[in-house]
């Protein structure tokens, strides 16, 4: 597969519809999980311009940082801690409108609190 994604402008749903078959083609011939996760993270960040997108892998009672795109992240998250650890503990997806208001939120990146962001909060 080509290294370029072909995503047209449109709604988030339309972009996901266009992206999914391209991701499937991208990972179908690669057997290395790390390589596939790295490309998936890059494709999601490139398509949606997310602040951070990535993966954690289970290692014992912790989530360990795996391929990601964005600023430096927490390397390990304990079971039941923060949004990710809580989602793992509850075995379900959590949609959190404002992670700062989530009980037990783990602030992994100070970039969330730049002067522009601080000005927006004031």
Sequence positions of predicted segments:
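Intrinsically disordered, low-complexity terminal regulatory regions
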Residues: 1-66
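Single conserved hydrophobic/aromatic residue that forms the stacking wall/gate
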Residues: 113-122
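Solvent-exposed polar/charged
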Residues: 46-49, 89, 116
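Intrinsic disorder/low-complexity signal
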Residues: 2, 97, 118-119
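Regulatory sensory and allosteric helical modules in signal-transduction proteins
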Residues: 62-108
